[in-house]
């Protein structure tokens, strides 16, 4: 990282170290290329009344940072000084400012040796966007959220959920919850040693330790922590030596009453090319799935993001995004950011027509249009009932339950109204459909087998 000058007024001297930390964290998290493109020429100008004022070199850079990174920058400032309430970005320096120049530290997370990875620099590996406060909770993720929160808030060495195993598809919130656990512990119990990393990095560090004959240091590093969080554990499938080391690390931490949190794209029982003894241990504690989002959850996520970004978006645009971008949360938020950025840069109003044009490529890639008829056929086949049973009034459990599941999936995977869905199921009214959806949601709270079954049906339908 090249030396960067940071400018601030005399009255902002108490924020000198804060800005240097914020700038360094932006560099660590986003990397040199992105940092140099957007942040390297941003100066700290002034602070007053709990507001930090930054100066961007051009209107374009200012608008881009405001649309993409303003919340990240504010949260970073608040991490170091919680009296800061807002960040303002301008393009012209304030008159009469007395400038003090400092140099950013040049050490990055990549330069930190393995022996230094402790509670003091866990912050470098955590994304400031991912906290419990901005995690939107709904039926698909409420168990995982509650379990993650319990782990973070536990006053004992470990929670009752040890290990906590979170699984689900890409972009549904598993990584968000793991970062949120790390943030909560960092802020409320800073003396606890926490390691968060991907299984891929765990493997690379292990291989490096073998090559450099530093295996003892590697073992000491991972087996002396209070909380170990490993993301995407499926990466070690088929990696025999890494599995062996993970197995012994896992056992040591459990034996020493330390907390473990694991994430994966599938349940422990569905992992291939991994030893049975590891599978067994991964399921010792609480296994919580994060399944595909419902329309209501997607709507809540969009409304939360819009409020955070302090922008106004028409309701029909929000409804359109929630109905059309159904694959995962990451893609949903990306679509929202793209619409807002386009409006900022072109100064065009956000309308449904503009949104459809801006996202046409993304919508085309999502264009595996799922119909109620598709859902009825797949569910009927899965449960070995007649397709005609979907529109019948038969109340036998072996028929009624699949029909309720099909109604739930129709509401989750299609933009159809309750009334429209009811028509497809033998002209049933919207209250019948609403009752079916509510019944399935209640069952999903405690029935792990049903959650896995519905996840599987969603994957089949979406692919």
Curated annotation (Swiss-Prot):
Residues 125-343 are annotated as: Domain III, AAA+ region. Belongs to the DnaA family. It is found in: Cytoplasm. SMART domains: AAA, Bac_DnaA_C. Gene3D superfamilies: 1.10.1750.10, 1.10.8.60, 3.30.300.180, P-loop containing nucleotide triphosphate hydrolases. The keyword Ligase does not apply. It comes from the Bacteria. ATP binds at residues 171, 173-175. Residues 1-83 are annotated as: Domain I, interacts with DnaA modulators. Residues 83-124 are annotated as: Domain II. This is Chromosomal replication initiator protein DnaA. GO terms for biological process: DNA replication initiation; regulation of DNA replication. It comes from Rickettsia canadensis (strain McKiel). InterPro entries: AAA+_ATPase (IPR003593), Chromosome_initiator_DnaA (IPR001957), Chromosome_initiator_DnaA-like (IPR020591), Chromosome_initiator_DnaA_CS (IPR018312), DnaA_C (IPR013159), DnaA_dom (IPR013317), DnaA_N_dom (IPR024633), DnaA_N_sf (IPR038454). Oligomerizes as a right-handed, spiral filament on DNA at oriC. CDD domains: AAA, Bac_DnaA_C. Coiled coil: none annotated. PANTHER family: CHROMOSOMAL REPLICATION INITIATOR PROTEIN DNAA (PTHR30050:SF2). Residues 344-463 are annotated as: Domain IV, binds dsDNA.
């Amino acid at each position: 990282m090249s030396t960067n000058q940071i400018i601030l007024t005399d009255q902002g001297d108490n924020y000198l170290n804060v800005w240097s930390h914020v700038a360094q964290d932006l560099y660590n998290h986003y990397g040199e290329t992105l940092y140099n493109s957007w942040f390297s020429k941003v100066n700290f100008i002034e602070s007053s009344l709990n507001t930090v004022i930054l100066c961007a070199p051009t209107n374009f850079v200012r608008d881009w940072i405001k649309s993409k990174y303003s919340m990240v920058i504010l949260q970073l400032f608040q991490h170091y000084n919680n009296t800061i309430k807002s960040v303002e970005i301008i393009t012209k320096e304030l008159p009469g400012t007395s400038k003090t120049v400092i140099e950013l530290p040049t050490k990055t997370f990549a330069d930190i040796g393995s022996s230094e990875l402790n509670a003091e620099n866990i912050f470098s590996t955590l994304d400031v966007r991912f906290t419990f406060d901005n995690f939107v909770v709904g039926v698909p993720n409420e168990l995982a959220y509650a379990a993650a929160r319990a782990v973070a808030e536990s006053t004992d060495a470990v929670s009752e959920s040890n290990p906590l195993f979170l699984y689900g598809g890409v972009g549904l919130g598993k990584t968000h919850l793991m970062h949120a656990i790390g943030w909560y512990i960092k802020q409320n119990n800073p003396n606890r040693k926490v390691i968060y990393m991907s299984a891929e990095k765990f493997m690379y560090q292990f291989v490096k330790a073998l090559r450099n004959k530093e295996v003892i240091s590697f073992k000491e590093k991972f087996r002396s922590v209070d909380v170990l969080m490993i993301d995407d554990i499926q990466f070690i499938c088929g990696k025999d030596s890494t599995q062996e080391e993970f197995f012994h690390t896992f056992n040591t931490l459990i034996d020493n009453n330390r907390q473990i949190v694991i994430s994966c794209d599938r349940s422990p029982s569905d992992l291939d090319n991994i030893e049975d003894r590891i599978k067994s241990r991964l399921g010792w504690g609480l296994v919580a799935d994060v399944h595909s989002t419902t329309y209501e959850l997607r709507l809540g996520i969009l409304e939360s993001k819009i409020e955070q970004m302090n922008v106004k978006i028409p309701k029909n645009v929000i409804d359109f995004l929630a109905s059309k971008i159904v694959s995962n949360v990451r893609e949903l938020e990306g679509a929202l950011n793209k619409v807002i950025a386009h409006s900022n840069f072109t100064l065009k109003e956000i309308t449904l027509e503009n949104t459809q044009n801006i996202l046409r490529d993304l919508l085309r890639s999502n264009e595996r249009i799922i119909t109620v008829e598709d859902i009825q056929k797949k569910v009927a086949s899965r449960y070995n009932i007649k397709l005609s049973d979907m529109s019948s009034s038969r109340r036998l459990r072996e028929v009624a339950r699949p029909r309720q599941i099909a109604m739930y999936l129709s509401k989750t995977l299609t933009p159809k109204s309750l009334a429209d869905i009811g028509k497809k199921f033998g002209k049933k009214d919207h209250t019948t459909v609403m009752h079916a959806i509510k019944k399935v949601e209640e069952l999903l709270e405690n029935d792990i087998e049903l959650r896995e079954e519905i996840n599987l049906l969603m994957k089949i339908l979406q692919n």
